Amino acid sequence: MISNLKIHHLGFVVKDIDNYLKNSFIKKIENRIYDPAQKAELVLIKSINDFYFELIQPKSDDSYTYNFLKNHEGGYHHTCYIIKSDKEINCYLNEKNLKQFLGPMPAILFNNKLVSFCINKNKEIIEFLHDY
């Protein structure tokens, strides 16, 4: 049986990061980069208790998140959980019947730690940050 996982961040797709930040209460950005693998600009914002928000701005029509922005005009996109081992991720994939569709791949926003993306039965995108 699996236990509760620690949520690392919630990801939001936005049309324009600068415009989004200008209209929000966010004051401190932890990290801002362009990720060539995702073809997107990414911003990591630290909240309390090591909880983060990620803003994702697709930069081309072949970005992973471009269709999401086009179809939904942005908004909540995914939840990222921290995992501590390959055994742990395999347990979650099997027990929750998750379908992995991307990764593991290095994530420049997280100092090239590996990330994997899955979808669950609720059609929610789940990201796993491999913290080992």
Regions found by a protein language model. Give the residues of each.
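Short beta->alpha connector loops
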Residues: 36, 60-62, 85-86, 108
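Short, conserved turn/kink motifs that form compact alpha/beta structural patches or helix kinks used as
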Residues: 56-64, 76
